[in-house]
């Protein structure tokens, strides 16, 4: 997804020079012509704590200004996984399968116990 003005983003990398860690939320406040984005980070009072030029590979869009909606969870996960190395992506897939299988077993067990 191409970032747009006022989209909400989540950092994928630490930015020690700005004292920002991966996972920090910010907002695109300017789109530069060279495919970099000026991203503003604020504190709880809405005061700017950092203004950083970032490449799109350094963050994920998590809130779309145009639609005024959060990125659906499945899309958020998929976008994050695409930034992982192949082996880490396979670990995520294995974990998702584990969770799915566990949920299926719980559903089967509760259905059996309730007599349905």
List PLM regions with ranges.
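Basic/aromatic-rich interaction segments and small domains that mediate binding to polyanionic partners
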Residues: 3-58
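Mixed-charge, Lys/Arg-rich low-complexity intrinsically disordered regions
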Residues: 1-15, 86-87, 94, 100, ...
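Intrinsically disordered, low-complexity linker and terminal regions at domain boundaries
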Residues: 62-72
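C-terminal structural segments of small proteins and small subunits
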Residues: 47-48, 54-61, 78-93
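Compositionally biased, intrinsically disordered low-complexity segments enriched
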Residues: 12, 32, 40-42, 60, ...
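Short amphipathic alpha-helical interaction elements located at domain edges
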Residues: 70-79, 87-116
